[in-house]
Amino acid sequence: MRLWSWVLHLGLLSAALGCGLAERPRRARRDPRAGRPPRPAAGPATCATRAARGRRASPPPPPPPGGAWEAVRVPRRRQQREARGATEEPSPPSRALYFSGRGEQLRLRADLELPRDAFTLQVWLRAEGGQRSPAVITGLYDKCSYISRDRGWVVGIHTISDQDNKDPRYFFSLKTDRARQVTTINAHRSYLPGQWVYLAATYDGQFMKLYVNGAQVATSGEQVGGIFSPLTQKCKVLMLGGSALNHNYRGYIEHFSLWKVARTQREILSDMETHGAHTALPQLLLQENWDNVKHAWSPMKDGSSPKVEFSNAHGFLLDTSLEPPLCGQTLCDNTEVIASYNQLSSFRQPKVVRYRVVNLYEDDHKNPTVTREQVDFQHHQLAEAFKQYNISWELDVLEVSNSSLRRRLILANCDISKIGDENCDPECNHTLTGHDGGDCRHLRHPAFVKKQHNGVCDMDCNYERFNFDGGECCDPEITNVTQTCFDPDSPHRAYLDVNELKNILKLDGSTHLNIFFAKSSEEELAGVATWPWDKEALMHLGGIVLNPSFYGMPGHTHTMIHEIGHSLGLYHVFRGISEIQSCSDPCMETEPSFETGDLCNDTNPAPKHKSCGDPGPGNDTCGFHSFFNTPYNNFMSYADDDCTDSFTPNQVARMHCYLDLVYQGWQPSRKPAPVALAPQVLGHTTDSVTLEWFPPIDGHFFERELGSACHLCLEGRILVQYASNASSPMPCSPSGHWSPREAEGHPDVEQPCKSSVRTWSPNSAVNPHTVPPACPEPQGCYLELEFLYPLVPESLTIWVTFVSTDWDSSGAVNDIKLLAVSGKNISLGPQNVFCDVPLTIRLWDVGEEVYGIQIYTLDEHLEIDAAMLTSTADTPLCLQCKPLKYKVVRDPPLQMDVASILHLNRKFVDMDLNLGSVYQYWVITISGTEESEPSPAVTYIHGSGYCGDGIIQKDQGEQCDDMNKINGDGCSLFCRQEVSFNCIDEPSRCYFHDGDGVCEEFEQKTSIKDCGVYTPQGFLDQWASNASVSHQDQQCPGWVIIGQPAASQVCRTKVIDLSEGISQHAWYPCTISYPYSQLAQTTFWLRAYFSQPMVAAAVIVHLVTDGTYYGDQKQETISVQLLDTKDQSHDLGLHVLSCRNNPLIIPVVHDLSQPFYHSQAVRVSFSSPLVAISGVALRSFDNFDPVTLSSCQRGETYSPAEQSCVHFACEKTDCPELAVENASLNCSSSDRYHGAQCTVSCRTGYVLQIRRDDELIKSQTGPSVTVTCTEGKWNKQVACEPVDCSIPDHHQVYAASFSCPEGTTFGSQCSFQCRHPAQLKGNNSLLTCMEDGLWSFPEALCELMCLAPPPVPNADLQTARCRENKHKVGSFCKYKCKPGYHVPGSSRKSKKRAFKTQCTQDGSWQEGACVPVTCDPPPPKFHGLYQCTNGFQFNSECRIKCEDSDASQGLGSNVIHCRKDGTWNGSFHVCQEMQGQCSVPNELNSNLKLQCPDGYAIGSECATSCLDHNSESIILPMNVTVRDIPHWLNPTRVERVVCTAGLKWYPHPALIHCVKGCEPFMGDNYCDAINNRAFCNYDGGDCCTSTVKTKKVTPFPMSCDLQGDCACRDPQAQEHSRKDLRGYSHG
């Protein structure tokens, strides 16, 4: 349960809500309940925040724990050096390019020969949060390639998750011109926005390597040889900041270097220290400091140039980003910080804390909620409990006289919107809620109609089902509403949510811990506390809620102590056992730890229990059978008062830490917060040492002043603030979940990319039983956020934590507007977002004060967690703030003139030193006249080593030393090796070892990527060679479990559903639609077959998911059986699945009283559709077979080498001479006796093939293999076969055909000929198969040319040169349509006549055409009366024959011509003889109705409609009836019929029928059976996996058969364009 923690700019540590809130449920859709009016919102159809809207509304939400330090640390700015000791001159600022991501990519135009065989790229950059994926930082492209856009190399940012807006990382991709496919390597973690990063990529012809801040984070050996040949040099182009496909990067680039050699890691680290400043070396091809960008770089066509800025990128050398552990939330969970509070008693000096008891009275000041005796007794107990821990409490009692509040039931934990929702909610089941509005009562059916509106509150009708007696029980004129009003929508109801009470009282939570009283339902909840990392911790909505029945009562006083423990950051002592999500939860506590469980290493693991002693074993303890020395007497346990009596030292340290981190306002003392960590030594000379230190723990840089914004100001006088007021036009959810107020304050979503109730979503307000609303184009839905302090902004940060799967990163946020004080709205346009990296936007040249923003989205499920606005430097709001000062204390003391200096920055250089002397340094924070406690001390021996000097001092606990103070580069700032890194040498060179392709001894058992699946010595693992499964189709084929499992797959627990991407690596029953499968128990199974039957020692099952569902605590089990060669089954029992125990190894225990048996298959069965299995192995004894051993006869012995019985012989047997062609042999002896060994190494261009018993074990390109002589035979048969390059294809030479008479193995040659119309350019048309298995670079090319374009009918060629042959690919020819013809597809208003065709990459021209101009059909009243010479096309003549009398009447001929502009030259008239009216239409089909307001005369129209308003009128073919319309038929809709001049109705009413119309739920991700037909566009694609937005079909209703009415019927869907594999079985 790790929070979303960021290191934003200089580092952002998150703070968020506590554990326990449920994640957002899957949205269901049912008919809405009737009879309940909508809850009143803050305005018509709007949803507003809890505060009144206005720029100076209530105080803003507090900053996160850690203050502004954790909120944002601005880009490292070089500080003014301290006057004392700052002898070095600050280096001048360097230049950096800023790319906004909108077409500023640059192209290298300098005449440089780009590296062909090896290269190194080095760049300093600072990427913005939110990028188009992929975002190209720089890359080498081939502008001549027609077939491959990925030739060359690219360094950039892209997402590696199946979800295309999750987990963005730095990447390095490469594809040489000889390679068949591209290779991409990725950084080890998501990139950090706003941080300066030193990125390097190298390729030496054999290995690709990616470095981040000097650490090698990825490597690959897939690409080999040169990148491109000299022949294609002119085709290569170097791009910066994007690609020609607009994969543009957003952020800064500084110090760009390109080398034509692969630099070593040591050289890269050295380059990092010099910040990219190199002396001129012959290997250095390009070094850019952006002094003259236009000299070497040019923008793309129609593009612009990036901005050039001055950058002070590398000022402070100390990385102050302190991460909490995986299970922690804030700085106080950081192991280094909490260690200081544990070790230093000065950090636990006495603290006085104010708290306020809120006591409600009647108006006459009688009948208090709690008595004064209760208050005093509880206060005494509280003081006694905390006295020994240096925490004392100052009591303030607030007496509120308000009968309306006093007489109401205050509910502690009931969501009032659930009252009367037809589900019994135990937390709302109370007599004064009408037992959850009647939901928790079995109701009879009284004579409600008789009692309705009888002027009496009838309690047997006072339930939601009867509209609470028609409202009479909430009428204060009729009844005592404090006892009878249960309607949650009535203002007179008898109960209040405790948050409603808090909103009424509006008590400041920043000066006191507020204590409220509320009752719970039958659950009898004793108390509820606000965590210190909650947004509400310092607001009026924070505080503690206690049950007044227990408060201050003997035997129950420890409840308040327990809840105060929560408010001060303490978890339950049983958190690591009983409050984990599953037994695979990384926070499960197996031993006391600062990083798991309750984050205290002096509380042993314990389950939840109430006994005063160690608990017994339970069913929910994840395999724990017993617990000893549990902290049952701890205040944070659930034992009774007579048992609990203490906190542990670690808990006391946490409480003191949170009092410094969050709750300084609760304390009367003005003492500033301390610096929680010891100063760090950053460098030394012969006569000086340089120290830097961390900010104070509360993150403040300025003295706090009442009414000022100084607590929001950072170094550089930059103000950072979160939104304080939120609103949206969307309606509001009564529960507050997903409402705008959730986007106020700091980010608090724990698991980004998963739906969370702690966010705003456009869909928030919708009743979960109805269909979600859409956010219509072009504007969509929007959220408006206002900030307390209007300011001129420098940047904006937005946390978008969830985006629907049907939206990519570029479409979800379609606009952001800045709301200026002047009234102007500034649009920032659409933005690319990641769900796990915040969006950061640099605000250029705004130049005026901004007070708010509007965020627009087209995604109704999008979720926004928070927004943060950062000012420009030296903002007026911070100019008057007084900075905190620092005092450095030394032992031995500093000279008086030095000791008296107060430092404004966090750096100090001591020049008063003696070689070999021991010095200790402390730092004290000074605010006004108050001083903090001294920081922990750092001990420094002048002239000796320290963390950061490049030498590992193991006696000081150092594990590595890379000469810097940066986290995330393998060696932490405290010189400790980071997880999954290995560091070597001095100074340390660190590399991410998991997945680097090298199997090292320390990772043999842990790294599947590098070492494969670990097999213990003496055993042999066989992976499945075939498989059959119970449920499969093309989405989840069973064959994927054949062979070893994919190394890249990590086991996942607590999933909601399984994405289609999993089926590429693991099998799961995807044909079952979860959770509907839970309606009936289903058994799923797979059967794995093995090529070599063996005596099983164990069965191994590799998992990708362990079957646990997000909303359920139940663990899944599997049943495993062995199948022997006689098809008999041997049960291995039931086994619990857990990602913590993956792979699952099931030992096979043989009954020694029975004969051994050979197993040939394994059957695995389970009941959860969320189990995904990636591999099954059969483990047996290596070189030992008990079945064969038992069959040996007299005179025979078992041969392990042969694995068979052989005749026993005492004489020594030599092996035959070992002869391997194309190999070199290195034998341990010239003799070939038993035990002799020979090492076989294949020559260059040959590959080892190793066989045993004529079966190929493996083929490897590795250097050698060792064979051993065993009992007269070599234990392996080895051959060296030439590598095979396979037949060349278009990747080698485009537009060519190949001939390989010599074959395709090493050394052979193939020739190629150019296919017409391509022409050979060059002389040598031969390719050679090289030793690396790839073809050599071609020395000639086939240049594609187009012949003269063919004539286009009805068009004239306009380009004269196009009449000749030899046109290059990409060239154009222009045509113009002849009069009366136009280009197809052009609009009716402006019919285009000119068009171009292009010479394409296959040597042909794009097709062009000219189609005749057409006129609209004549009016329908003339239908059937006219004849046309050529339809309605240009020059066609249409005629109606009239009698001669028309001409005599001067009407002229009834003839019209279609003109070239698509209009008729005239119009028809009704002939004189055409008189009368149509007959009354009476032959109507059932349900059809005609309305003829103008009668039945010629030209009159009748509107068609259906008696059933849900039906539509259509025309059906004669042979089709309404009852048998096939789903693929899409009949024409009819809105009206007309009486023609021939006195006939058109269309004829007898052909018109009424059919069921389409429900308005198309495209809503639910497959509605009624809409699953062509007439309704197959429900907008909702019924096919390939077309539904969520890629998972959800039927509605859920009983709808996925093989019947809700089947995929759309003939255009992908499912019907490929072979259906359903039912196909491997086995």
UniProtKB/Swiss-Prot annotation:
<feature type="disulfide bond">
    <location>
        <begin position="1285"/>
        <end position="1329"/>
    </location>
</feature>
<keyword id="KW-0862">Zinc</keyword>
<dbReference type="Pfam" id="PF00084">
    <property type="entry name" value="Sushi"/>
</dbReference>
<feature type="disulfide bond">
    <location>
        <begin position="1558"/>
        <end position="1576"/>
    </location>
</feature>
<comment type="similarity">
    <text>Belongs to the peptidase M43B family.</text>
</comment>
<keyword id="KW-1015">Disulfide bond</keyword>
<feature type="signal peptide">
    <location>
        <begin position="1"/>
        <end position="22"/>
    </location>
</feature>
<dbReference type="InterPro" id="IPR011936">
    <property type="entry name" value="Myxo_disulph_rpt"/>
</dbReference>
<feature type="disulfide bond">
    <location>
        <begin position="1227"/>
        <end position="1238"/>
    </location>
</feature>
<feature type="glycosylation site" description="N-linked (GlcNAc...) asparagine">
    <location>
        <position position="1323"/>
    </location>
</feature>
<feature type="glycosylation site" description="N-linked (GlcNAc...) asparagine">
    <location>
        <position position="825"/>
    </location>
</feature>
<keyword id="KW-0677">Repeat</keyword>
<dbReference type="GO" id="GO:0007166">
    <property type="term" value="P:cell surface receptor signaling pathway"/>
</dbReference>
<feature type="disulfide bond">
    <location>
        <begin position="327"/>
        <end position="622"/>
    </location>
</feature>
<feature type="disulfide bond">
    <location>
        <begin position="332"/>
        <end position="657"/>
    </location>
</feature>
<keyword id="KW-0865">Zymogen</keyword>
<feature type="disulfide bond">
    <location>
        <begin position="1051"/>
        <end position="1139"/>
    </location>
</feature>
<feature type="disulfide bond">
    <location>
        <begin position="775"/>
        <end position="781"/>
    </location>
</feature>
<feature type="domain" description="Sushi 5">
    <location>
        <begin position="1476"/>
        <end position="1556"/>
    </location>
</feature>
<feature type="glycosylation site" description="N-linked (GlcNAc...) asparagine">
    <location>
        <position position="480"/>
    </location>
</feature>
<feature type="disulfide bond">
    <location>
        <begin position="1036"/>
        <end position="1070"/>
    </location>
</feature>
<dbReference type="GO" id="GO:0008270">
    <property type="term" value="F:zinc ion binding"/>
</dbReference>
<dbReference type="InterPro" id="IPR024079">
    <property type="entry name" value="MetalloPept_cat_dom_sf"/>
</dbReference>
<feature type="disulfide bond">
    <location>
        <begin position="960"/>
        <end position="971"/>
    </location>
</feature>
<feature type="glycosylation site" description="N-linked (GlcNAc...) asparagine">
    <location>
        <position position="1226"/>
    </location>
</feature>
<feature type="domain" description="Sushi 4">
    <location>
        <begin position="1413"/>
        <end position="1473"/>
    </location>
</feature>
<feature type="domain" description="Sushi 2">
    <location>
        <begin position="1283"/>
        <end position="1344"/>
    </location>
</feature>
<feature type="disulfide bond">
    <location>
        <begin position="474"/>
        <end position="485"/>
    </location>
</feature>
<feature type="disulfide bond">
    <location>
        <begin position="1314"/>
        <end position="1342"/>
    </location>
</feature>
<feature type="disulfide bond">
    <location>
        <begin position="1506"/>
        <end position="1554"/>
    </location>
</feature>
<feature type="disulfide bond">
    <location>
        <begin position="1362"/>
        <end position="1373"/>
    </location>
</feature>
<feature type="disulfide bond">
    <location>
        <begin position="457"/>
        <end position="473"/>
    </location>
</feature>
<feature type="disulfide bond">
    <location>
        <begin position="1428"/>
        <end position="1438"/>
    </location>
</feature>
<feature type="disulfide bond">
    <location>
        <begin position="414"/>
        <end position="428"/>
    </location>
</feature>
<dbReference type="InterPro" id="IPR035976">
    <property type="entry name" value="Sushi/SCR/CCP_sf"/>
</dbReference>
<feature type="disulfide bond">
    <location>
        <begin position="424"/>
        <end position="440"/>
    </location>
</feature>
<feature type="region of interest" description="Disordered">
    <location>
        <begin position="733"/>
        <end position="754"/>
    </location>
</feature>
<dbReference type="GO" id="GO:0007565">
    <property type="term" value="P:female pregnancy"/>
</dbReference>
<keyword id="KW-0325">Glycoprotein</keyword>
<feature type="disulfide bond">
    <location>
        <begin position="1377"/>
        <end position="1410"/>
    </location>
</feature>
<feature type="glycosylation site" description="N-linked (GlcNAc...) asparagine">
    <location>
        <position position="1026"/>
    </location>
</feature>
<keyword id="KW-0479">Metal-binding</keyword>
